[in-house]
A protein has these predicted regions:
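Active-site-adjacent structural elements in enzyme catalytic cores
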Residues: 1-212
C-alpha cells in the first residue's frame, strides 16, 4: 500500500486528522508526525509489535532505545523508576522543548523500548500536533526520528517518503518543521549527569541549570 499523506496545521491541528492518526497508533501501527525539531515516528510504546514496527521501518539496531514523547512532567514520571532531583530541575526549565532526558525506566515499559538497557529517553515536545495526538491516543507515544538509521533527520514529509517509502501507512504533513538541530540528550544517574548528544540546548546551558 502506498503511504497516505494527510495535511495538518501545526498551529491549529484539525481534530478529525488527529483522531484519524490516533486510530492508527491505537491499532499498533507507526505514523510519521511533525515535532518541534524534525519529523518523528509515532507508535504505542506499550505495544510490542508496534515497537518492532518502528525498528523495522527505520532499520534501527534493537540495542538502541526509542525516545518517548510525553505531554507533561507528571506523565513522564509514570515511566521513571527512580527520579533524580536533576530530572525535575531540567524538565521544569526546558520542557516543553528540545531536551531529552535518559533515566531508569519503570517495568511498565517493554524492555525492547529501552533497547534492552532498562533506561528510557523522555521528551515533552513543544508541538501542538504531538500534544493533541498524545491526548487522542490516551498516553505517551514514541518519538524517534522519522528516517532510516544512519541517514539525515527529515524536516518535511517528502524527505520521509524518500527514505522510508511505503514502510509507513500514514504521514501527517505540516510542511517544514524548520528544524536544524535535534534535541539535546542528557543522561541522569543519581547525582551524576552527562550530555550524550549536544543539540538545540548547548552543554554549558545544562551545566548552568544544574550548578546555579
Amino acid at each position: 500500500m502506498p503511504v497516505e499523506l494527510l495535511k495538518i496545521s501545526s498551529e491549529s491541528p484539525e481534530e478529525h486528522v488527529v483522531e484519524y492518526a490516533a486510530g492508527f497508533v491505537k491499532r499498533g501501527e507507526v505514523v510519521g508526525i511533525p515535532t518541534d525539531t524534525f519529523y518523528g515516528l509515532s507508535a504505542d510504546p506499550f505495544n510490542l509489535s508496534a515497537i518492532e514496527g518502528v525498528f523495522r521501518a527505520k532499520g534501527r539496531p534493537e540495542t538502541k532505545a526509542l525516545p518517548i514523547l510525553v505531554n507533561s512532567v507528571e506523565q513522564a514520571l509514570t515511566l521513571v523508576r527512580e527520579m533524580p532531583d536533576s530530572f525535575l530541575e531540567l524538565a521544569n526549565t526546558y520542557w516543553p522543548g528540545p531536551l531529552t532526558l535518559v533515566v531508569e525506566a519503570t517495568h511498565r515499559l517493554p524492555l525492547k523500548v529501552t533497547g534492552n538497557t532498562g533506561r528510557v529517553a523522555l521528551r515533552w515536545a513543544n508541538s501542538k500536533v504531538v500534544s493533541k495526538l498524545i491526548d487522542a491516543v490516551g498516553g505517551p507515544i514514541t518519538g524517534t526520528s522519522a528516517n532510516l538509521s544512519g541517514y539525515p533527520s527529515c524536516s518535511n514529509a517528502g524527505q520521509i517518503v524518500e527514505q522510508l517509502g511505503n514502510r509507513l501507512p500514514l504521514i501527517l504533513d505540516a510542511g517544514d518543521t524548520g528544524g536544524t538541530l535535534a534535541s539535546t540528550i542528557v543522561r541522569l544517574d543519581g547525582n551524576e549527569w552527562r550530555v550524550v548528544r549536544e543539540g538545540a540546548i548547548p552543554d554549558e546551558q545544562i551545566y548552568k541549570t544544574l550548578h546555579h
